[in-house]
Swiss-Prot record:
Keyword Metal-binding: yes
Zinc finger (PHD-type): 80-132, 278-330
Domain notes: The PHD-type zinc finger 1 mediates both nucleolar localization and interaction with UBTF. The ePHD2 domain folds as an integrated structural module comprizing the C2HC pre-PHD-type 2 zinc finger and the PHD-type 2 zinc finger. It mediates non-specific binding to dsDNA, but doesn't bind histones in contrast to many PHD-type zinc fingers.
Main subcellular location: nucleus
Glycyl lysine isopeptide (Lys-Gly) (interchain with G-Cter in SUMO2) crosslink residues: 173, 227
Protein name: PHD finger protein 6
Motif Nucleolar localization signal: chain residues: 157-169
Alphabetized GO MF terms: DNA binding; histone binding; histone deacetylase binding; phosphoprotein binding; ribonucleoprotein complex binding; scaffold protein binding; tubulin binding; zinc ion binding
Zinc finger residue extent: C2HC pre-PHD-type: 14-52, 209-249
Keywords per UniProt: Acetylation, Centromere, Chromosome, DNA-binding, Isopeptide bond, Kinetochore, Metal-binding, Nucleus, Phosphoprotein, Repeat, Transcription, Transcription regulation, Ubl conjugation, Zinc, Zinc-finger
Amino acid sequence: MSSSIEQKKGSTRQRKCGFCKSNRDKECGQLLISENQKVAAHHKCMLFSSALVSSHSDNESLGGFSIEDVQKEIKRGTKLMCSLCHCPGATIGCDVKTCHRTYHYHCALHDKAQIREKPSQGIYMVYCRKHKKTAHNSEADLEESFNEHELEPSSPKTKKKSRKGRPRKTNLKGLPEDSRSTSSHGTDEMESSSYRDRSPHRSSPNDTRPKCGFCHVGEEENEARGKLHIFNAKKAAAHYKCMLFSSGTVQLTTTSRAEFGDFDIKTVLQEIKRGKRMKCTLCSQPGATIGCEIKACVKTYHYHCGVQDKAKYIENMSRGIYKLYCKNHSGNDERDEEDEERESKSRGRVAIDQQLTQQQLNGN
């Protein structure tokens, strides 16, 4: 019995990314594995792959990307040799279109390429060391396009790259396999714009509909994440489940219902602000305010990422218990439930004593 468990653990440790063929989790992000165990890829290797884009379909996904698309990109990578290590799987191309340098993610780091990452806009770009200056010179153009304070690169000024600062989704389906495999940039025409929307959580910046301050998507995810509550005065919005399990939100009592999903709006806004510094264990995006209940555990999630990572949610409405245990600590919930029940009874007795004391004082 124990030997089979050890073998299973050993096989998990031996799994390698389909792109970089390594276990470099520290450099390349978490190694994500599909449910059928057939596809494995580092999150960063997928985010920066030139022809891979986010998927919002109901089919099984890997870190927000379609399993089918990841497999196609891994297959495309078998024909692309890395400019640094000369091994296949190098699907990350320099974002200067005329440049033929292509990398694995960790090789781009080692070759001192410039990594540009702006999760809030779905922008993930790489400039080889030769074209760093090009990226630096075009930062001002991008800042003007997005009207934000953070500086990110735009592409060099060429006729084909005139649409600056417009993240978009590229649909590669329906193209011949050869056209997807001949270049580290996917297809030339489809990569004529500088930016590729790789974020698993973001839609087009032209979409002005309210988005959840935690998971960054809108009402299209209401079925899975609960109603999207909107607070127009503060220009804030949040899904019910995202608020319910966030570590710092306060749900109001039945006698003082708020208009913002029964939550104290002040605590929701504070949590959204805190979430900007909290990156998700699964997808590495900000807004992950749902932490594992084990104090020594540092795992933190968006609501849907916790579900995808097989974390265990404890939801007991009658007792006001809403907790998450990561998959490594999901066995701790039963013991913790007993502790919580004892604490709840203790709090109930204290409340009754306080009420009796208050009645006695009022009687006097």
